């Protein structure tokens, strides 16, 4: 347990002294992050984003988007959750340039701190650096950096949910490529190499805030899972592995973009490193989603030994 926490503290893209706590799943890691942020700030509000996926426990489901698939019939949900749209460059208004669109998203973020909740009542802003379930959408660097600035200015804890991105984007953490240092980061999935383990890593002064007994669990950080995670982290951060990840990412992206040029059904190819997605649309002008086509493609791929999954708000 201690050896894994020390390793995570070493590699996490967080400024200053760090501490970690282990748990069983990404959802539990996110729950811990919110509890710790609330303990540290003595505030309750949490700002999250449309398209976000943070888990399926009650609190993390409250933070999660895509109502019909994940949330239908499971309310009421946790209070003090505030949600605004996240940047989605592929579907930006056509009159905007890329930079103008990011400006508009930042303006929307700043407006939320007047129209929805005062910054003095916000404990945390939680965001996936690459939104996974929303459709592998990398957040614009400038948008993340503005979140960082606002959190620093108002004493808000910035939480990066890297449960899905950890080890999958060409760097150990996606934040490393997107130019931002969060206060707290959550990791799971690839961390355990198939075994159930997750971690919440953060600035030491924040992690020390909860009272004794406030955060923990019986099975968090089992010896077997810790051994697997230590080996996984060391493999994932090795220069040879990262070089291969970068190579595969470039290869996949170039091949998928070539396919896009020959198939009007492919509206967009996007992601970060080898964490890539193809969005299927009925029409490239209207960008009308094509979920039935996506399901048909997936079934054919699975039948031929290639495992794919659907993602995105429209499952396309």
Please identify what each model-predicted range represents.
Residues 1-316:
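Conserved N-terminal phosphate-binding loop of PLP-dependent enzymes in the Aspartate aminotransferase
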């Amino acid at each position: 347990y201690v050896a894994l926490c020390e390793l995570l503290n070493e590699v996490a893209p967080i400024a200053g002294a760090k501490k970690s706590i282990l748990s069983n799943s990404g959802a539990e890691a996110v729950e811990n992050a919110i509890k710790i942020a609330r303990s540290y700030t003595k505030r309750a509000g949490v700002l999250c984003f449309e398209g976000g996926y943070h888990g399926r426990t009650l609190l993390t489901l409250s933070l999660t988007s895509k109502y019909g698939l994940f949330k239908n019939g499971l309310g009421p949900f946790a209070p003090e959750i505030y949600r605004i749209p996240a940047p989605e460059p592929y579907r930006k208004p056509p009159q905007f340039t890329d930079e103008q669109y990011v400006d508009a998203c930042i303006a929307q973020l700043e407006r939320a701190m007047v129209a929805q909740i005062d910054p003095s009542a916000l404990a945390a802003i939680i965001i996936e650096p690459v939104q996974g379930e929303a459709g592998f959408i990398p957040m614009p660097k400038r948008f993340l950096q503005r979140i960082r600035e606002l959190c620093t200015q108002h004493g808000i804890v910035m939480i990066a949910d890297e449960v899905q991105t950890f080890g999958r984007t060409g760097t150990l953490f996606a934040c490393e490529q997107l130019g931002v240092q969060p206060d707290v980061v959550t990791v799971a999935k690839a961390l355990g190499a198939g075994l159930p383990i997750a971690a919440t890593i953060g600035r030491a002064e924040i992690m020390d805030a909860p009272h004794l007994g406030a955060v923990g669990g019986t099975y968090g950080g089992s010896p077997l899972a810790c051994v697997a995670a230590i080996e996984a982290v060391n493999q994932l951060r090795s220069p040879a592995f990262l070089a291969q990840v970068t190579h595969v990412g470039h290869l996949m992206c170039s091949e998928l973009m070539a396919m896009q040029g020959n198939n009007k059904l492919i509206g967009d190819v996007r992601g970060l490193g080898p964490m890539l997605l193809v969005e299927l649309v009925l029409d490239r002008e209207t960008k009308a989603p094509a979920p039935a086509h996506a399901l048909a493609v997936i079934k054919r791929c699975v039948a031929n030994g290639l495992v794919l999954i659907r993602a995105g708000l429209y499952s396309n």
